[in-house]
């Protein structure tokens, strides 16, 4: 059943991006830097960091829905001819009576003239820890990803555009605010999501809640939820608030001891707050071939659902969407998807080249009396059934583990089933991705007849995407699945493909209109 660490990590990234960012900037009210490449900086706006404080150490409590969940820590320091900016967030979250601690942090090192040198990102969930190091050169970025004792190395292009490092963005944004700017538009690179470029807009709204502060409303292209920040005269954020359907996430400036005390509680139970109860039981979903489900947002926002695999949708004249799930239906693989190497690549989460994963894939196929020349559909189903039986410890206690770790532990919930199946498929040369959304359960976490958050797998079979749920014992899929996002899971850090989940979590009502057996 459901895993929430991935989505909570995106919430963490939101805090990291908004409060202290690696940014590009373009602001019509003040000067705009004109450069030829991402390494050059010039002019008064983007110059060296002279005039900035050489040290800053800020701590925040973090709460969700009024419940303290943990802390956020930011540090800026000048170390000789280098500048280091560190951000870290630690949250403890309830999960159906249990609790999980999620920790994400990044450390960016640059030279005093603004040249990026290295960025290290760490993410920990339970006992699972991953680390990614980005080392910058003039033309590319060398990436080393480590998790579960294995390291994968690759190269990636440098992010395009005018590079502003953390020290520069702190100085420049503060300068524009002091100059009286009422709207600042800039571009940021989020270290926690693979140096993804994010467009951001910050608008002055008036006086803040905290004394002698100004409120700024910040929106960004990565996460569909705005954040309010109360900023003091020195440019420091005193309070930030992100409105979410499951409850506002609030960070408040405090002392280190106060921040660390706030993580002592079990945190808000996000599984409980995000489940959707049905007005009447619908157990027929588990055995049917087709279902039509009406989905509405509770706050009136437009809903975004993909048409992929078994799922299609259309507008509901009464509001929201009609979502149709047909177990026998597939969706054609687009030319872009066909050319996308990520669906066959190894990553920290889906390490299809791990010898243990390769061995499991071969064992699964041979135990079904198949081989590499057997039809793709038959091999895909054999792999799905194998994963269902292979993971014998089916619970919520396992952190978001990669396929390599699951191959050893035989433990996990829906996310571990999904990533292990995706890895086995790729080991057999079958392109795959992870699907995320909601699934019907007759009973879960003490509640009956609910839709709860869930992950499964999609595979390319004969030019089409098919849905495969490795948590099911009697069939490969059923129409009680609502798909919200798919992802290649090609990065050990945060995945922007799941950002749509944030605006949907806790913000929908669901009605089963009819079911066809």
Regions found by a protein language model. Give the residues of each.
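Hydrophobic/aromatic-rich core segments of domains that either
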Residues: 214, 223, 234-236, 417-505
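Bacterial N-terminal signal peptides
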Residues: 9-20
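Secondary-structure boundary elements
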Residues: 164, 329-412, 420, 479, ...
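Short Asp/Glu-rich motifs
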Residues: 81, 406, 443-445
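Sec/Tat signal peptide C-region and signal peptidase I cleavage site
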Residues: 22-24
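Bacterial N-terminal signal peptides that target proteins for export
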Residues: 1-11
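Acidic, serine/threonine-rich low-complexity disordered tracts
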Residues: 26-33, 48-140, 144-158, 168-332, ...
């Amino acid at each position: 059943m459901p895993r929430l660490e991935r989505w909570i990590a995106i919430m963490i990234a939101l805090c990291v991006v908004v409060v202290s960012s690696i940014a590009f900037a373009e602001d019509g009210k003040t000067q705009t830097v004109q450069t030829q490449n991402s390494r050059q900086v010039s002019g008064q706006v983007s110059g060296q960091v002279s005039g900035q404080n050489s040290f800053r150490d800020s701590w925040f409590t973090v709460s969700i829905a009024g419940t303290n969940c943990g802390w956020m820590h930011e540090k800026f320091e000048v170390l000789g001819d280098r500048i280091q900016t560190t951000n870290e967030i630690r949250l403890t979250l309830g999960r159906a009576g249990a609790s999980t601690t999620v920790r994400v942090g990044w450390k960016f090192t640059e030279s005093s003239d603004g040249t990026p040198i290295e960025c290290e990102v760490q993410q920990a969930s339970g006992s699972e820890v991953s680390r990614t190091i980005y080392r910058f050169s003039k033309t590319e970025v060398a990436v080393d990803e480590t998790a579960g004792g294995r390291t994968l190395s690759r190269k990636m292009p440098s992010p395009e555009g005018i590079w502003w490092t953390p020290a520069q963005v702190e100085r420049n944004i503060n300068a524009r605010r002091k100059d009286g700017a009422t709207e600042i538009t800039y571009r940021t690179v989020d270290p926690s999501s693979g140096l993804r470029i994010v467009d951001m807009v910050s608008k002055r709204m008036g006086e803040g809640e905290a004394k002698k502060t100004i409120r700024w409303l910040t929106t960004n292209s990565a996460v569909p939820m705005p954040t309010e920040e109360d900023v003091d005269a020195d440019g420091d954020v005193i309070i930030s608030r992100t409105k979410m359907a499951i409850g506002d996430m609030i960070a408040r400036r405090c002392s280190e001891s106060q921040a660390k005390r706030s993580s002592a509680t079990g945190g808000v139970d996000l599984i409980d707050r995000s489940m959707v109860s049905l007005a009447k039981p619908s157990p027929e979903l588990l055995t049917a071939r087709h279902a039509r489900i009406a989905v509405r947002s509770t706050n009136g926002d437009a809903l975004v659902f993909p048409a992929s695999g078994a799922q299609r949708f259309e507008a509901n004249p009464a509001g929201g969407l009609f979502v149709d799930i047909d177990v026998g239906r597939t969706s054609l693989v687009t030319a872009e998807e066909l050319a996308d190497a990520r669906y066959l690549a190894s990553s920290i989460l889906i390490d299809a080249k791990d010898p243990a994963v390769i061995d499991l894939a071969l064992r699964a196929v041979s135990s079904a009396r198949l081989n590499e020349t057997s039809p793709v559909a038959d091999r895909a189903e054999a792999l799905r059934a194998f994963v269902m039986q292979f993971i014998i410890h089916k619970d919520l206690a396992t952190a978001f583990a990669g396929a390599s770790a699951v191959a050893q532990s035989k433990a996990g919930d829906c996310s571990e089933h999904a990533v292990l199946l995706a890895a086995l498929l790729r080991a057999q040369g079958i392109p795959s991705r992870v699907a995320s959304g909601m699934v019907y359960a007759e009973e879960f976490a003490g509640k009956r007849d609910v839709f709860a958050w869930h992950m499964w797998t999609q595979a390319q079979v004969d030019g089409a995407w098919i849905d495969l749920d490795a948590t099911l014992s009697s069939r490969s899929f059923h129409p009680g699945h609502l798909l919200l996002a798919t992802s290649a899971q090609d990065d050990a850090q945060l995945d922007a493909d799941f950002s749509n989940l944030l605006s949907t979590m806790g913000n929908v009502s669901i009605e089963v209109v009819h079911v066809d057996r």
